[in-house]
């Protein structure tokens, strides 16, 4: 099961995800949650508590990346879990998405874009 909650400050939103990003009802709920944030300059997807992602989940991330960026909003992945990072690397999608390490606090992240990092194996 996938859950998502949103935190907003200024022109930035953080969508905190927990559970599994896999084919099923959770994907459309996550899609709708992210697309409701299009009025923001930057949307971070916090993937630190995602323990599994499948091809359907990857497809959703690519769809969101393309859709959101095409409308002038940046979509960035925040602190992907080890499993998500491994899948992103295996599929070479780590070169498509901007990955950010965890911020010390969410407010720190929301007030600055942070520094992207290279995903390590």
What are these regions (language model features)?
Residues 1-52, 63-121:
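STAS-like cytosolic regulatory interaction modules
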């Amino acid at each position: 099961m996938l859950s998502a909650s949103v935190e907003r400050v200024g022109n930035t939103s953080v969508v905190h995800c927990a559970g599994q990003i896999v084919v099923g009802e959770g994907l459309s709920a996550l899609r709708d949650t992210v697309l409701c944030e299009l009025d923001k300059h930057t949307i971070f997807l916090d993937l630190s508590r995602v323990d599994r992602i499948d091809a359907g989940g990857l497809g959703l991330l690519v769809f969101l990346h393309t859709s959101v960026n095409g409308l002038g909003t940046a979509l960035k992945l925040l602190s992907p879990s080890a499993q998500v990072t491994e899948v992103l690397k295996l599929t070479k999608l780590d070169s498509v998405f901007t990955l950010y390490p965890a911020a010390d606090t969410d407010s720190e992240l929301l007030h600055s874009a942070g520094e992207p990092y290279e995903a390590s194996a």
